[in-house]
Amino acid sequence: MLTGLVVTPDKNDVNTDTINALKTIKQVPPGTYSVLKTNIIGKWFINEQNLVFHRQPFSTLVCQNEVQQSSLMNYLIDETSTLSTMRSYLENAVKKRVCTTERPIACLLSGGLDSSLICALVAKEVRETQGKQIETYCIGLEGSDDLKYAREVASHLNTLHYEIVVTEKDFLSAIPEVIRKIESYDTTTVRASVGNYLVSKYISENSSAKVIFNGDGADELMGGYLYFHKAEDPIEFDKECRRLLSHIHFFDVLRSDKSIASCGLEARTPFLD
């Protein structure tokens, strides 16, 4: 894999774009494809790029004519209908992932809203369809709020809960290996990947679970980061959500997928349906 930052062999320039580490190498975004052809001397070139395989319609309800175009705006600002639709979509996103795997399931649980919602839905679905408890895992420093609140959520959901207590030294020591696993030097991505990698390593070594649910994507989708409170208006809020989602495969999804997959596990992110 190409993971260097230096352009070769002609120029010794560092690329400041953390999305594409090499200036002469371009990534093909997920869900797209490029068409390569040869010229008259047999040299390959990109004829078409970033062609989309499939794109989900804005609203399946609108596409199914269940909502008339004239009443679309009323539908969008109807809080009750919006919340009901969001809940239905999230429940279906969890259900289809639970029902299409025969491998043991576990959930990453930080005690926050996003992971707790996913854990609750997964626990309910597994209990109703398989009659089993799910395993939940939380990682954190001794005395951290994550451990405390995850413990409370796990108790409420009646899960088989495990805590991985680590030290600051454990986190720092894991950074070189994490960089190799996720193939990224992006500071925020690396920092956020360490916990994912360590908890996944623990699961891989101590559990039969192979399919790992998490709450990734909710902050980008719902504007969950603290700086969203500074948005000037709903339009700017929405623009920032769309910007984050358009690049999420370079950062949060990359972190979630590679740090978990590097331990032989499969990540599931229902919020990103």
Task: List each language-model region with its residue ranges.
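Conserved glycine-rich, hydrophobic/aromatic-active-site segments
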Residues: 94, 98, 178-272
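Amphipathic coiled-coil/heptad-repeat helices and related helical stalk/stem segments
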Residues: 146, 171, 195-196, 273
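Cysteine-centered catalytic environments shared across enzyme families
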Residues: 1-184
